[in-house]
């Protein structure tokens, strides 16, 4: 079935998965929305009110066993999700074993159904202005070449690329260099970066700036105007421009070879429950806000705030509205949390961040 072309501001090629989570002690919870695509979409949705939220796209393949409770939760987001009926198969389910120390073991319970460029073409999502892609370097290049074949790269969409953990190996260093030319934001986490560089992951947090410096040496983006945004867990993120770039934000500049640090949102004790999907939400928010503002610092600040909502529960943050019809997530306004985050940055961080807060963004 072909779908009509849509006016799409954001799309993710990440998958939709329904998670089952088992904890130490044997407790289980089921029917939890998961998958990189779901979290990337919510990262974008947090910064997009209705009706504009209908321009945020994702493909959800509904198997014969798709739960109504999941459909209701997805529909409550009021996005441009495209549902494909696939009654001959089971919906993609995942099993998660979550240990008390935070370690997570994941495996698929039913076959996965990856999303590629032909799927975006079929569903009318191909001409999105921003695209979130999570895959290995070789497939990333292939997807981007397919996008070019279908005509989207002529429109120069903004692309954020998350490399998959299993592909972050030293032997993929060469293809990584080719892949980076296609993305506007390259966003690995600190562990993936260490694995790519052949460095013990026990040193990943302490050497994160070294990783950014290594990635900066490559051409990022078709015109070397791209960014490395390394996600460093509870330590926030690091932002670096391609070294051949003359990149500058509108008022706040990240000079070539300078690496800018943005801390994570300061969370209340006991408010962090599950960090799954935080990186995906970060990337979804980052690419959309970079497209909208042209300011990598502002985009990453908003992405950091988006991630903070994802870690407060298993699955997606709870969506409600206040008496004025404003979106609330876990009972809070995303804009209020951003305001508090900027206030924290103004008192704790470098002059570039203080300059950003002076602008009132």
Curated annotation (Swiss-Prot):
InterPro entries: Mak32, PfkB_dom, Ribokinase-like. GO terms for molecular function: phosphotransferase activity, alcohol group as acceptor. Pfam families: PfkB. SUPFAM superfamilies: Ribokinase-like. It comes from the Eukaryota. CDD domains: MAK32. This is Uncharacterized protein C16C9.01c. It comes from Schizosaccharomyces pombe (strain 972 / ATCC 24843).
């Amino acid at each position: 079935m072909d779908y009509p072309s849509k006016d799409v501001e954001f799309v993710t090629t990440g998958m939709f998965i329904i998670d089952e989570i088992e904890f130490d002690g044997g407790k289980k919870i089921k029917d939890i929305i998961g998958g990189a695509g779901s979290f990337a979409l919510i990262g974008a949705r947090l910064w997009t009110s209705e009706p504009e939220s209908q321009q945020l796209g994702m493909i959800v393949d509904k198997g014969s066993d798709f739960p109504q409770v999941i459909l209701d939760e997805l529909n409550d987001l009021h996005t441009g999700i495209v549902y494909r009926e696939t009654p001959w198969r089971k919906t993609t389910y995942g099993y998660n074993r979550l240990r008390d120390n935070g370690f997570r073991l994941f495996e698929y319970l039913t076959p996965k159904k990856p999303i590629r460029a032909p799927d975006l073409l079929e569903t009318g999502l191909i001409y999105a202005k921003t695209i979130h892609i999570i895959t290995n370097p070789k497939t990333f290049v292939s997807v981007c070449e397919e996008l070019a074949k279908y005509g989207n790269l002529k429109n120069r969409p903004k692309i954020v690329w998350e490399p998959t953990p299993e592909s972050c190996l030293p032997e993929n260093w060469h293809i990584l260099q080719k892949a980076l030319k296609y993305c506007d934001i390259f966003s690995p986490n600190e562990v993936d970066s260490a694995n790519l560089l052949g460095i013990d992951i026990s040193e990943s947090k302490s050497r994160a700036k070294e990783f950014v410096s290594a990635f900066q040496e490559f051409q990022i983006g078709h015109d070397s105007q791209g960014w490395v945004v390394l996600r460093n867990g509870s330590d926030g993120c690091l932002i670096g421009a391609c070294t051949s770039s003359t990149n500058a934000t509108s008022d706040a500049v990240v000079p070539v070879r300078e690496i800018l640090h943005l801390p994570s949102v300061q969370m209340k004790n006991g408010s962090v429950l599950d960090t799954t999907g935080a990186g995906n939400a970060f990337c979804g928010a980052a690419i959309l806000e970079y497209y909208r503002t042209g300011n990598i610092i502002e985009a990453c600040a908003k992405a950091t705030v988006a991630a903070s909502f994802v870690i407060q529960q298993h699955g997606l943050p709870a969506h409600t509205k206040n008496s004025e019809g404003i979106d609330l997530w876990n009972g809070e306004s995303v804009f209020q949390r951003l305001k508090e985050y900027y206030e924290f940055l103004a008192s704790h961080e470098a002059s570039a961040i203080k300059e950003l807060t002076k602008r009132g963004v």
